[in-house]
Amino acid sequence: METLNLFIRSIFIDNMVFAFFFGMCSYIAVSKSVKTALGLGAAVTFVMVMTVPLNYLLNEYVLKANALVEGIDLSFLSFIVFIATIASFTQLVEMAVEKFSPTLYNQLGIFLQLIAVNCAIMGGSLFMQQKVDAGAIGNVWQSIVYGLGSGMGWWLAIVMMAAIREKTAYSHIPAALKGPGIAFIITGLMGIAFMIFSGIKL
């Protein structure tokens, strides 16, 4: 039940976009088409599913105090190690997308490479570390579930945003609000709507 609660919370309650506003650059820039949003969301989710558990293992057996050697604490290296892990998997995703879906690769452009510096992915690993210290994540399986839930939460957010923006293309929006302006307003409204999930406890 704790694992299910962790999964549900990471998608709806602790949503990377609506709760923490992480990954906003690619969220706003790539959410003009549902097809493109689906592709980027899948890529981000894959990277999070792979990097969060890997960073969990690195944190538990290398970085934490007394993990490698008694009296040695390498937790100050967390940022560098996590970024290196994320960058490595981003390269794998980029090569796979370029080989198997050149059209999607061209549509995503530089934003596929920018997954490496997507703060939602980095946030997933840092929040995992925080949850480990708080006792909410206690094993690799739970870290995988948390990575999957966080990735799916971001994926859900960008696909919803893309679907709405496709509709707004045919709406009468004031010139001053077209583009990022209306996107931020819609994001705020969706964030308020997602607050309804904050009372859920499993």
Set out the residue ranges of the language-model regions:
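C-terminal ends of transmembrane helices
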Residues: 22-36, 90-104, 161-172
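Juxtamembrane transmembrane-helix termini in multi-pass membrane transport proteins
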Residues: 5-46
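Cytoplasmic-side transmembrane-helix entry/capping segments in multi-pass membrane proteins
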Residues: 36-46, 77-82, 104-115, 176-182
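Interfacial loop-to-transmembrane junctions
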Residues: 166-185
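Hydrophobic core segments of alpha-helical transmembrane domains in multi-pass membrane transport
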Residues: 22-26, 44-50, 83-92, 117-124, ...
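Structural signature of hydrophobic alpha-helical transmembrane segments
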Residues: 5-19, 72-86, 144-157
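Ordered, amphipathic secondary-structure segments that act as subunit-interaction surfaces
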Residues: 60-108
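Generic transmembrane alpha-helix signature in multi-pass membrane proteins
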Residues: 21-29, 94-100, 111-114, 119-135
